[in-house]
Amino acid sequence: MEEFKRYLELDRSQQHDFIYPLIFQEYIYALAHDRGLNGSIFFENSGYDNKSSLLIVKRLITHLITQMYQQNHFLFYTNDFNPNKFLRCNTNLYYQMIFEGFVVVVEIPFYLRLLSFLEGKERVKSHNLRSLHSIFPFLEDKFSHLNSLLDILIPHPVHLEILVQTLRYWVKDPSSLHLLRFFLHEYPNWNSLITPKKSSFSFSKRNQRFLFFLYNFHLCEYESIFIFLRNQSSHLCSISSEIFLERISFYKKKDLEEVFTKDLTAILWVFKDPYMHYCRYRGKSILASKDSCLLMNKWKYYLVNFWECYFYIWSQPRRIHINQLSNNSLDFLGYLLSVRLKPSMVRSQMIENSCIIENASKQFDTLVPITPLFRSLSKAKFCNMLGHPISKPVWAASSDSDIIERFGRIYRNLSHYHSGSLKKISLYRIKYILRLSCARTLARKHKSTVRSFLKRLGVGLLEEFFTEEEQVFYLTFPKASSTSGKLYQRRIWYLDIFCINDPANHE
């Protein structure tokens, strides 16, 4: 986005929020293909104006129409030559060229709003806040004072037209929205790009950026209701929410203004809660409160109705679970989160009498879910379904140092991510599985038994390699067990973790 500061020159049409003319700018396609103006894929005459080049897009569209025409009317080829496959590839290429430039154009209004919002304000850049572990200190500080929460699976739109309807509140240019509809309906195999497969989206790598943009915009619109209710019910309004609530018109029909004003007080009274906390990662969010389950149940059915009325998404109530933190655990970001009572006894001795005072304090607890880890290791062929280590014959062709380095890297990644748990017994079992699987892989390579191979190699080599740690920045808290000088007995949150490492991805 930094290139926009250099290349973006808005004329009068863009000042009126018309972004369609930007499609005819050459630098848009240069930015889309991560190239400078000198390395552009387009070639113009030396005397031609590069600022507004209609010939660029016209050339692409001409090629596109020509190829589509030839694909439908070439009927006189022999059986040895199939032109449709070749022409279809070229058609997809021209579609892709125009589409990638259009992706950059659609992102410009949001980038300009961000620049105007940050203008004159000091912006603190901290890459540590991008770490997945940065959310756990917040949960550790807040969840011990809360009673119940909503475990929410955010539904995704069943049709991309819903995203276009939502996007029109931000993009005021009808021509750009019509062009977006054209790509969504005419792009080859477009429907397969967002088809759910095994609880995840099957994204094309080249279109991944735009699909993530649409999906994140959908999540942003979903979260705007929390910001709106919070700002209306609290005097401490969130400054960062100004960007999200800037709309053309929040309510279109004037007839609804009186009804909305009349019912707003009742709605805010129902959902007013000074101890409401919200966090989200991808399509899963948590809404926690200090109040009873009655308020959580109201929030549950309110969200279901909100999705159906605003996003036209039918969502089952079972996608939202009401969870009591003191009774159940929550599976979130690879941890089992819970709040348990920690009893403590204080004996008071007076002159003649003594008494024992029993007290219980809430403590935020994080555990490592061992069953999903076993399932992931079994999927990656490091162990069977029962957790018994097996060899990795696919890696047997590599060198000994490469095999040991692969197994050690997987364990260090898992240990690094799950360092926030005080109970490390699960990590010890994972370490045992990977060490023995590594030993069996090496023994299989050298056609020997595990016992004789370890006797010749020495167990200390594997032990030293698996316990090797990198120097990274981490957070520890006084509330953790700090009586022992050993670091592994503390709860540690690292600030360099940007994704969840799955052993199945280390193929």
Swiss-Prot record:
InterPro entries: Domain_X, Maturase_MatK, Maturase_MatK_N
Gene Ontology biological process terms in this record: mRNA processing; RNA splicing; tRNA processing
Localization in the cell: Plastid, Chloroplast
Pfam families named in the record: Intron_maturas2, MatK_N
GO CC term, one of those recorded: chloroplast
Keywords: Chloroplast, mRNA processing, Plastid, RNA-binding, tRNA processing
Single annotated GO MF: RNA binding
Entry-linked PANTHER family: MATURASE K (PTHR34811:SF1)
Membership in a protein family: Belongs to the intron maturase 2 family. MatK subfamily.
Function recorded in the entry: Usually encoded in the trnK tRNA gene intron. Probably assists in splicing its own and other chloroplast group II introns.
Name the record gives this protein: Maturase K
Gene that this sequence comes from: matK
